[in-house]
Amino acid sequence: MIKVYGDIMLDRWIVGKARRISPEAPVPVLKEIEQQFCPGGAGNLAVNIANLNGEIGVYGSIASDKEGYRVIECFSNFKKINFRASLDSKKTTTKNRLVGQGGQHICRWDREEKYTGEDAFNRLLSELSENDVVCISDYAKGTVREGTIQRLLDRNCKILVDPKQNVDFYKGAYLVKPNLREFKNWFGKFSKEK
């Protein structure tokens, strides 16, 4: 089975029309039309795998706040996802976006606190089976920490990582997939001519 572990978030879009500039500051005034919610971070990875017809478990941490319950509600729409997140006292990480009707992003603000517990990882370890693949989605919010990779390697798992931290942090993983900015930070700029 595929297990996704990492920083679970809520993605929220407030979609509206921006037809004028505020008299209080040079910013657009957005008239809200609708709000949209979906799992973000490790939750987004879980949804993408489920949409490929994969059956998966998702592990991480959310809070028992309204955003955390919204994440649970979002996952209830996916029958192939076994939502195994732990509840924590921290705030559920939420990425809020103000978006005009044409898709133009006007603003984004984040609400977050670092996760400091071990419950999510201990639950993952207790439910690992032989031949499980663990996909780690690390946004450096505290879920993935020093020793995470080694403890999974000790359980003979294949580990695939979407990283945020230094490359050495993921030593031993089967696959580490940085984005271009992370790659350049780790190894420097590269030339197409070489």
Regions found by a protein language model. Give the residues of each.
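Divalent-cation-assisted or electrostatically stabilized phosphate/pyrophosphate-binding catalytic cores
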Residues: 26-33
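Ribokinase/PfkB-type carbohydrate-kinase core domain
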Residues: 1-19, 34-194
